[in-house]
Swiss-Prot record:
Name of the protein described by the UniProt record: Hematopoietic cell signal transducer
Membrane topology label: Single-pass type I membrane protein
Region (GRB2 binding site): 72-74
Cytoplasmic domain ranges by topology: 57-79
Biological role stated in the UniProt entry: Transmembrane adapter protein which associates with KLRK1 to form an activation receptor KLRK1-HCST in lymphoid and myeloid cells; this receptor plays a major role in triggering cytotoxicity against target cells expressing cell surface ligands such as MHC class I chain-related MICA and MICB, and UL16-binding proteins (ULBPs); these ligands are up-regulated by stress conditions and pathological state such as viral infection and tumor transformation. Functions as a docking site for PI3-kinase PIK3R1 and GRB2.
UniProt record, GO biological process: natural killer cell mediated cytotoxicity; positive regulation of phosphatidylinositol 3-kinase/protein kinase B signal transduction; regulation of immune response
Molecular function GO terms recorded: phosphatidylinositol 3-kinase binding; protein-macromolecule adaptor activity; signaling receptor binding
Coiled coil region boundaries: none
Localization of this protein: Membrane
Presence of the UniProt keyword Flavoprotein in the record: no
Source lineage: Eukaryota, Metazoa, Chordata, Craniata, Vertebrata
Region (PIK3R1 binding site): 72-75
Length: 79
């Protein structure tokens, strides 16, 4: 469950968003198409990298132990 501080932040976020003016972004310009394409491509590469690392880590983690052939009395399915 989320800590109470996070819930308070979520409740106050719309209030803070309503306090900002539409033109309050000084010096902000439109993003160029190559920059936007680069950001999307970088996001896709990072997402695939994270998925790959998680897949490799879970695959290594799920390998059975070398002593998996032992018989355990109180563990059904292992004997």
């Amino acid at each position: 469950m989320a800590p109470p501080g996070h819930l308070l932040f979520l409740f106050l976020l719309p209030v803070a968003a309503s306090q900002t003016n539409e033109g309050s972004c000084s010096g902000c310009g439109p993003l160029s198409l190559p920059l936007l394409a680069g950001l999307v491509a970088a996001d896709a590469v990072m997402s695939l990298l994270i998925v790959g690392v998680v897949f490799v880590c879970m695959r290594l983690h799920s390998r059975p132990a070398q002593e998996d052939g032992r018989v355990y009395i109180n563990m059904p399915g292992r004997g």
